[in-house]
Amino acid sequence: MILERIVTDNLPDLERRKMRLPLAKLQELVLDIPYPPIDMAMKLKGRQVRLIAEVKKASPSKGIIRSDFDPVDIAGIYARNGASAISVLTEEHHFMGSLDNLKKIRESGVASKLPLLRKDFIHDPYQVYESRLYGADAILLIVAMLSPERLQELLSLSHKLGMKCLVEVHTRSELEIALESNARIIGLNNRDLHTFKIDLTVTERLRPLIPPECIVVSESGIQTRADISRLEELGVDAVLVGEALTASVDIAAKMRELL
């Protein structure tokens, strides 16, 4: 299973980071951050569907998506062309991301008014704290890889630190767990993380089950304006798009096409 392999492959890296920067010291550094996170929920509300544009170099299914990959340059293009938030993949082994990319984007100022979402396979409170330290305003939590108890723990910690959570589901049972945890930003992933197959009807099936007070984000497999129009008709608030943008020769032109 791809999801399980990704989590396993990253465990040694997490342990090394804990050795280099112990949790107690990490917590001190986070508490000293002078500025609050940007509210991603506020950025995703509106009459028109919002775009979360993803900084993504590679994926397990496609390999390297963009060889001339400059995360700061890409984030700047997103910020100038209508993105409401920027997702930054930080998983190293399968997506060729890094926490340093997140930090560089935040410190560069190219997207100073947009929330940054750390997209990774987060399962440990340590990762929540380090997300804040490296400049994230929000984090991804994947229900498929978390117990209900751990999901609630990570949600509570994130909110304590002022960060929002995009809680990702793929099935009805996962959605029920997310709603029971009082998640307010629900990501409907059209990709099965166990097989990496795409099915856009996932959003169609699950969207009617989500109460109106939640913000709904459709993720994965979104390639065209027609895809977004279809999702808009289903009542989603935002879409998360990665490969369709980073694979484009002209990212700005692709954004104009989608929006």
Curated annotation (Swiss-Prot):
Query: From what superkingdom does this record's organism come?
Result: Bacteria
A Gene Ontology biological process in which this protein takes part is: L-tryptophan biosynthetic process
Q: Name one GO molecular function term.
A: phosphoribosylanthranilate isomerase activity
Q: Which SUPFAM superfamilies match?
A: Ribulose-phoshate binding barrel (SSF51366)
Q: Does the keyword Lyase apply?
A: yes
The UniProt entry, under CDD domains, shows: IGPS
Q: What catalytic activity is recorded?
A: 1-(2-carboxyphenylamino)-1-deoxy-D-ribulose 5-phosphate + H(+) = (1S,2R)-1-C-(indol-3-yl)glycerol 3-phosphate + CO2 + H2O
Instruction: State the EC number(s).
Output: 4.1.1.48
InterPro entries per UniProt: Aldolase_TIM (IPR013785), Indole-3-glycerol_P_synth (IPR045186), Indole-3-glycerol_P_synth_dom (IPR013798), Indole-3-GlycerolPSynthase_CS (IPR001468), RibuloseP-bd_barrel (IPR011060)
Carries keyword Chloroplast?
no
Provide this UniProt record's keywords sorted from A to Z.
Amino-acid biosynthesis, Aromatic amino acid biosynthesis, Decarboxylase, Lyase, Tryptophan biosynthesis
Record PROSITE patterns: IGPS
Pfam families linked = IGPS (PF00218)
Pathway per its UniProt entry is: Amino-acid biosynthesis; L-tryptophan biosynthesis; L-tryptophan from chorismate: step 4/5
Q: Which family does it belong to?
A: Belongs to the TrpC family.
Stated name of the protein: Indole-3-glycerol phosphate synthase
- Organism whose genome encodes this protein: Dehalococcoides mccartyi (strain CBDB1)
| Organism lineage | Bacteria, Bacillati, Chloroflexota, Dehalococcoidia, Dehalococcoidales
